[in-house]
Amino acid sequence: MKYKIEKNTVQETLIIPLYARKVCSELYPNLYRDETAVRLIDEIDYDFSEAEKNSRGLMQRFGSLEVAVRQNDLAFEVRDYLKGHPNAAVINLGCGLDSTGRSCDNGSCKIYNLDFPDVIAVRNELLPAGEREENIPCDLNNTEWFAKIDASGGAVFFASGVFYYFLTEQVRTLVQRWRTLSPAVCWCLTLRIGRR
């Protein structure tokens, strides 16, 4: 049975990056491959007709490449961090339906996927947490979720396209608080902030 995502919901925001990763996987398989995105598109009940119609245009092709390059860059940084901190916490902020944490799994790290409760509800249906993985429903600005993170082996935070929705001061406050989790913290963020 397919998972229904309605138009004009927070859950609908999952579609754009997921579809971009699928399109890039199809158009440029030697550059980028996201089997999870390809599979998930088939498991979601959503009207993709407009996305499909637009997906072959130059701007959409460029956008899908941009998403893929961003994901590859973040994955490279996470894997590099794990070389020196193999038992670290890998924390995907605003995870949506992204599987970057899993693709970086070294067999001993702990993976935490954080997003709003309604997004985590979708994720739990389509991408249930695996071994050493936890899907945490939360508001990133409410740092009570820190208590659920085991950062004793270090922590690498990554966020892709999340901070467009944050004020500059909110990002500054979060980064300052993250430093309290572990002395060995790394941030891999796309920091184009949407609101001042």
Provide a role label for each language-model segment.
Residues 156, 175-195:
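Conserved beta-strand signature within the Rossmann-like core of class I S-adenosyl-L-methionine
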Residues 155-160, 171:
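A short beta-strand submotif of the Rossmann-like class I SAM-dependent methyltransferase core
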Residues 140-143, 163-165, 193-196:
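Short, catalytically relevant binding-site loops at active-site mouths
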Residues 1-91, 95-138, 151-152:
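Rossmann-like AdoMet
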Residues 146-157:
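A short acidic, Gly/Pro-enriched loop at the edge of an enzyme's catalytic core
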Residues 135-137, 144-146, 165-183:
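A short, conserved alpha-helix within the catalytic core of class I
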Residues 114, 159-160, 189:
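Active-site flanking residues adjacent to catalytic metal/cofactor-binding acidic residues
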